[in-house]
Amino acid sequence: RIDGKLIANRLEPGKRPRSSMAPTIVLKDGRPIIIIGSPGGSNIISFVVNSIIALLEWDMNIQEAVSHPHAINKWGKFEIEESLYSSNLENSLKAMGYDTKIRKYYSGLNGIYIDTEIYGGSDPRREGIALGN
């Protein structure tokens, strides 16, 4: 409480956040190298983390990373974005015991990658813009 008023979304043990917002800044040697965020309700965290992995582990540039199709595991069911769908992927997931669901996603990621220059990337699934040098 502040001045006797309850604080919405205050951090407390056992509470769940009222939002999945995940605006993220990734640092390297104390300096920002990635700034990224997305709308998308309960999918936001997966959208952001998948894009960071695409940048850092799969050597995609920022535009490729925010445009990449999604496959998200929710409570044991893999939701596969239509543009990523293949029967091989679906059959492989089912062979591992996962249920699957094919769907559209409207992530709307926007991000900036900073190296020797600044690069912007904006998800083509929604309107947006992120500019670099």
Predicted regions and their residues:
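Active-site rim segments in enzyme catalytic domains, especially the processed small/beta chain
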Residues: 1-34, 58
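Short, solvent-exposed loop/turn segments at the edges of secondary structure
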Residues: 6, 18-21, 47, 73, ...
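Extended C-terminal subregions enriched in glycine
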Residues: 14-17, 57-105
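Hydrophobic, well-ordered secondary-structure elements that form the walls
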Residues: 25, 48, 65, 112
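Flexible loop/turn segments at secondary-structure boundaries
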Residues: 33-34, 42-45, 74, 85-88, ...
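Second-shell loop/turn segments in exported
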Residues: 35-39, 77-80
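Alpha-helical support elements that line or immediately flank enzyme active sites
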Residues: 39-60
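Cofactor-centric catalytic regions
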Residues: 85-133
